[in-house]
Regions:
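C-terminal edge beta-strand
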Residues: 161-172
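Aromatic sugar-binding surface patches on proteins
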Residues: 116-137
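Sec-dependent bacterial lipoprotein signal peptides
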Residues: 1-21
Length: 172
């Protein structure tokens, strides 16, 4: 009798577990992570200097970076994560008159991109199904004295998508 009760209890637990809907448990907010911004400044009369830019967050949640000079180059690595979900897109907006911004070393993630829908030069990446993480470097160079926002937005198939992150850069 104990064996029959054990078998029935085990079958009931298996049936209960099989009827659960596990797919809806993976609803995570997609994340954007950035390495510390590195500034490279090189002028005709000086040696190239490399340093890490400091930053603080303002009341609106923008990362406000230290002031740099027109012509300095800032590089950082962008990491996108959808955790238990899949990436669907990434978009960067910036003032093209004030900044020259480019994605670098894209060969490493080209296999994950839907090239028909992506426009790398315009800051739009569209991901193929099945990818939940992407890492790539970006670089920007201020073209004129201005305070400029660089807004990054990552989308995933999560109901908590998208996520936005803004960097504010002042150049003199």
């Amino acid at each position: 009798m104990k064996k029959i009760s054990f078998v029935i209890l085990t079958m009931a637990l298996v049936l209960l577990a099989a009827s659960c809907e596990f797919e809806n448990n993976s609803q995570y907010t997609p994340q954007i992570a950035l390495s510390l911004p590195i500034r490279f400044c090189g002028h005709a009369d000086t040696v190239v200097v490399k340093d890490t830019l400091g930053y603080r967050y303002d009341k609106d949640g923008k990362a406000v970076l230290d002031t740099i000079h027109v012509g300095d180059t800032v590089r950082m690595v962008v990491a996108l994560s959808a955790q238990g979900n899949m990436l669907t897109g990434f978009h960067t907006t910036w003032d093209t008159a004030a900044l020259q911004l480019e994605y670098l070393a894209m060969d490493s993630i080209m296999v994950a991109l839907d090239t028909a829908k992506s426009n790398i030069a315009a800051g739009t990446l569209s991901f193929l199904p099945g990818y939940n993480m992407a890492v790539f470097p970006i670089r920007y160079i201020p073209r004129k004295s201005a305070t400029t926002d660089i807004t990054m937005e990552v989308q995933s198939d999560s109901k908590y998508s998208p996520t936005k992150f803004t960097i504010q850069q002042t150049a003199q």
